[in-house]
Amino acid sequence: MTARSRPGYFRQEINKTIWEVPDRYKDLKQVGTGAYGTVCYALDRRTGAKVAIKKLHRPFQSDLFAKRAYRELRLLKHMKHDNVIGLVDVFTADLSLDRFHDFYLVMPFMGTDLGKLMKMERLSEERVQYLVYQMLKGLKYIHAAGIIHRDLKPGNLAINEECELKILDFGLARQTDSEMTGYVVTRWYRAPEVILSWMHYTQTVDIWSVGCIMAEMLLGKPLFKGHDHLDQLMEIMKVTGTPSKEFTAKLQSEDARNYVTKLPRFRKKDLRILLPNVNPQAIKVLDGMLLLDPESRITAAEALAFPFFSEFREPEEETEAPPYDHSLDEADQSLEQWKRLTFTEILTFQPAPAVAESKETAL
């Protein structure tokens, strides 16, 4: 069903909801749906580019939902890097604040993600180098803004057929009680300090995740595949070794300190034995990432300088984002205030100059 709506817009029913979209976008097809929104593929008539349009599910049903929607919009507006997903466009068909109920985020359409790619084929060392290099460039940029991803995994690393990678869902992930129990795939890439809430964590939680993802790319299977959060910790310590007394003393929680001191003793394993036939330069990168003590892990900027990435390295592309002001979206606001702020962000969006697509961008 399609019908006319606001001038310059058209209406279309997708997944039992009405979408109101500018005429510049055509051929809408649903490609995904989740807890917070539905995503459609579309073609941008203006540039010829393939795009992904996300409609949030009832973004203003509560002040919590409104806060989340505002934060997602602001984060996407802030990001301007080839390896981090950013906004092509943002729009609403609602003409005034009192009628404002829905808005749509437009992003580049990538086609697949690393999780799907790894299921389809074993990746060559050269592709691992190129993909991890892009992950680290994206993380250096995000971390410079003062943002921690918190939930890096193969499924939110989008890839197109040119093997270009963009990080998705940065800064939005929040740990919940439901994620701490059961068989959750995400856990396989989580840093130990996040799994057990050991301490106030830093940007190096993302470096741990990259180490897990890189090891899986080289090994062909997850490195740490625990059945619950305690089993996950045991799997990790079989490789990293049991924490030192110095590290245990840093744990803020007395319960965590007591728990760790009662664990079986494990000796640190040599990654060269776990990943035989892997380039020693790749092992050096993993050795710097997969350390139990977050303070000892390498940063994204340090990792980029490792010889393993020298073939693809272009330091001028390793840029840093300007600082992101967290105070705006952590403020205590009413639902109406969040709506007003979001509406203003949409009206003030400045798109990048349009560049026509010269190549396919979907896998």
Swiss-Prot record:
The gene is mapk12. Serine/threonine kinase which acts as an essential component of the MAP kinase signal transduction pathway. MAPK12 is one of the four p38 MAPKs which play an important role in the cascades of cellular responses evoked by extracellular stimuli such as pro-inflammatory cytokines or physical stress leading to direct activation of transcription factors. Accordingly, p38 MAPKs phosphorylate a broad range of proteins and it has been estimated that they may have approximately 200 to 300 substrates each. A motif (TXY) lies at residues 181-183. Activated by threonine and tyrosine phosphorylation. The modification Phosphothreonine is found at T181. This is Mitogen-activated protein kinase 12. The active site is at D151 (proton acceptor). It comes from Danio rerio. One of its GO terms (biological process) is intracellular signal transduction. The modification Phosphotyrosine is found at Y183. The TXY motif contains the threonine and tyrosine residues whose phosphorylation activates the MAP kinases. Its main location: cytoplasm. Its EC number is 2.7.11.24. The keyword Transcription applies. It catalyses: L-seryl-[protein] + ATP = O-phospho-L-seryl-[protein] + ADP + H(+); L-threonyl-[protein] + ATP = O-phospho-L-threonyl-[protein] + ADP + H(+). GO terms for molecular function: ATP binding; MAP kinase activity; protein serine kinase activity; protein serine/threonine kinase activity. It is found in: Cytoplasm. Belongs to the protein kinase superfamily. CMGC Ser/Thr protein kinase family. MAP kinase subfamily.
